[in-house]
């Protein structure tokens, strides 16, 4: 298993922390001299990945063992034609997030951008991306939103709802919610 962490802001602090806390782990740090945005950063890091697919995780989420169990089960059933599969959270299982609108909805079995007529789903910060598909984008600085919108237009963006609780920790409110969890 390869673990790659994109770094830019405070990269020396992160590099030293990883080196000191996880010396026995094979963690590759992929430095972005210039910010490449979400998809561009993963595309840049993909040179370190030998697999066809990458599991991409955002760092502002507290990942529980149950979250990972659900994601790993989904990886086992992944089909080779998958371009991108998002892991989504229903609002009833989302903690530490105050968004009025969701990120996505499922309409007639298809994933689309949030539609207030359907239950709101949040992007969990986890996705599986085909690296060959990602590399087909000629840009080097670009967001996953571009990929998602392209795939939505083609009815090819996949999504799976994670049933376990999910904790967003991108601000102090979210951090305070999870500080006492095991």
Ranges and model annotations:
Residues 9, 85-103:
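Short beta-strand-to-loop element that shapes/binds the nucleotide-sugar donor at the catalytic cleft/hinge
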Residues 5, 56, 84-87, 159:
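Structural beta-sheet core signal
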Residues 55-57, 62, 68-78, 92-96, ...:
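Catalytic-core segments of class I nucleotidyltransferases/pyrophosphorylases
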Residues 20-24, 46-48, 73-74, 101-107, ...:
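Short, hinge-like loop/turn segments at secondary-structure boundaries
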């Amino acid at each position: 298993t390869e673990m790659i962490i994109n770094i830019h802001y405070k990269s020396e602090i992160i590099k030293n922390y990883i080196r000191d806390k996880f010396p026995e782990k094979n963690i590759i740090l992929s430095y972005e001299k210039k910010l490449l945005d979400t998809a561009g950063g993963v595309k840049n890091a993909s040179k370190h990945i030998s697999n066809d697919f990458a599991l991409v995780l955002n760092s502002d989420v507290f990942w529980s063992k149950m979250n990972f169990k659900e994601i790993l089960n989904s990886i086992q059933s992944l089909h080779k034609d998958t371009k991108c599969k998002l892991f989504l959270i229903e609002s009833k299982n989302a903690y530490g997030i105050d968004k009025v609108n969701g990120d996505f909805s499922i309409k007639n079995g298809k994933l689309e951008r949030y539609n207030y007529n359907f239950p709101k789903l949040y992007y969990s910060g986890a996705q599986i991306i085909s690296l060959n598909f990602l590399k087909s984008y000629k840009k080097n600085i670009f967001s996953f939103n571009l990929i998602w919108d392209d795939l939505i237009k083609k009815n090819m963006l996949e999504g799976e709802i994670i049933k376990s609780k999910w904790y967003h920790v991108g601000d102090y409110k979210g951090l305070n919610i999870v500080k006492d969890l095991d």
